Regions:
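Bateman (tandem CBS) regulatory domains
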Residues: 1-5, 53-65, 121-128
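The conserved cystathionine-beta-synthase
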Residues: 5-25, 31-34, 67-94, 103-115, ...
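A diffuse structural propensity rather than consistent per-protein peaks
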Residues: 12, 42, 56-57, 102
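A broad, low-specificity signal for short, low-complexity segments enriched in glycine/proline
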Residues: 26-30, 48-51
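Short hydrophobic beta-strand motif reused across regulatory alpha/beta modules
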Residues: 38-46, 98-106
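A short, polar/charged loop-to-alpha-helix boundary motif
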Residues: 44-59, 106-120
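Solvent-exposed, flexible loop/coil residues
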Residues: 50, 64, 72
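Short C-terminal domain-edge/linker segments immediately following a structured domain
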Residues: 60-61, 71, 91, 97-99, ...
Length: 128
């Protein structure tokens, strides 16, 4: 499954809002025409652009994002998690976008629990 991205200069708010709603996500990485990560956009801000009939996303691209190389170890990723509510994006040495680090993967890695055990813990917390 290829990671979904916002292509700067090619896609406007309408297309991105549809993409995000289809996948039930609220943030997308933004890449330039060469596939280089330039930032991220948030659904709330895209909805505002659409309301204002602005077709270009450049004004809402958040350029200060956390990104790591694919071979970064978990111990080096965890401190980043304390600084952001956004995903941590994975890039190569040229900053070409490759994917993201899902929070659930980090939790599984750190706790040693599998997805099923984590879901059980969550369910128990909901039922309390």
């Amino acid at each position: 499954d290829k990671p979904m991205v916002a292509r700067q200069g090619k896609e406007g708010p309408e297309v991105l809002i549809r993409k995000m709603r289809e996948r039930k996500i609220t943030v997308l990485p933004v890449v330039d025409p060469d596939g280089i990560l330039v930032g991220e956009v948030h659904l709330k801000e895209l909805l505002q652009l659409r309301k204002e009939r602005i077709l270009n996303i450049d004004s809402i691209v958040r350029k200060e994002v956390h990104s790591i190389l694919g071979d970064t170890v978990v111990e080096d990723i965890l401190p980043l998690m304390t600084k952001t509510n956004s995903p941590i994006w994975v890039v190569n040495e040229k900053r070409e976008f490759e994917g993201m680090v899902p929070l659930s993967s980090l939790i599984i890695e750190v706790t040693g629990k599998d997805k099923e055990e984590i879901n059980e813990i969550i369910q128990n917390a909901i039922e309390l």
